[in-house]
């Protein structure tokens, strides 16, 4: 796993024609209405508290993953308030439900910014939700902290990306498969922008590294029927599966994968959207031994992670697990606090100006903001799901990897963003 050099910022991609979570063309109209030209910021910093927005899917197909992210955001806010707040002001969270619908995310983002007057918003999961919100935050000149791994090929002055970009998750997973001798991979994903873009990148990687994509299949978000895809898997002569399914579709996929006798030793599945929180719903008997690619697992051995896991379980119950998106969300609030206090102001321009080089010691390890791309350094980790449902690291980068969202450090990726 290598660390590409930082490159100059490439302008943000326009979201209007990209795919939504249901595979249809993204309709920019709801976001365009939400993203009306801003007046002056209504954020009120004159009192003893400042509002922040929490925007996650608390209902719908993504609630299985996003509800716990909301809990980790609240934990970070509680910790910060107990430690004196931000610039001496208590954080007052305003929670909204994105309902697993991109248009709802855009509408709720506009409400949080214009009506609730929040200083920043933390949330989103699917790339469809992020791309629906992007024009709102840009038009209103407000800040979104987006905590989930994504397909890259984007940078916005109004988004801080605290999850992994492609070179910090997808590429390390492909490197691992190749190093383990896998050459014939089958791609299965949800039908929206993240899986389709990730798979375009995977196809380019495979072509340059002597690997073959022997199948590529998509299902609508929330789909639970995988018999046709599993039969294609059986007939494909694949020796590994790269899984970009999101939400509760993973439950049905792994159960049907196991039901036909497939197993990790024969045809391993590497997943980039299955973490500790999803394992119980899938059933550990259906997924033990399978691989994941993230930057954080509950089993990561750092003092900060020991404190994080203990605090989360003390707050929400001893049997609760922690996961990469939860940790990245938790870290994003602490990063924002560090940026605001470095700037000495809640002002968006001042916070952006202070962002570059801001460092926090997070549960996953050292995280540093790259001010050019507004992404962060991450430590790639390949994990294997254990019989107890936790994930153990089987390969880890020697040091945090700088973000390269446009893959400019990889010759094989030329033209991928076009």
Which residues does each predicted region cover?
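Bacterial lipoprotein signal-peptidase II cleavage site
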Residues: 22-32
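Extracytoplasmic "Venus flytrap"
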Residues: 36-74, 96-103, 125, 189-196, ...
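Periplasmic-binding protein-like
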Residues: 112-125, 145-147, 186-189, 237-247, ...
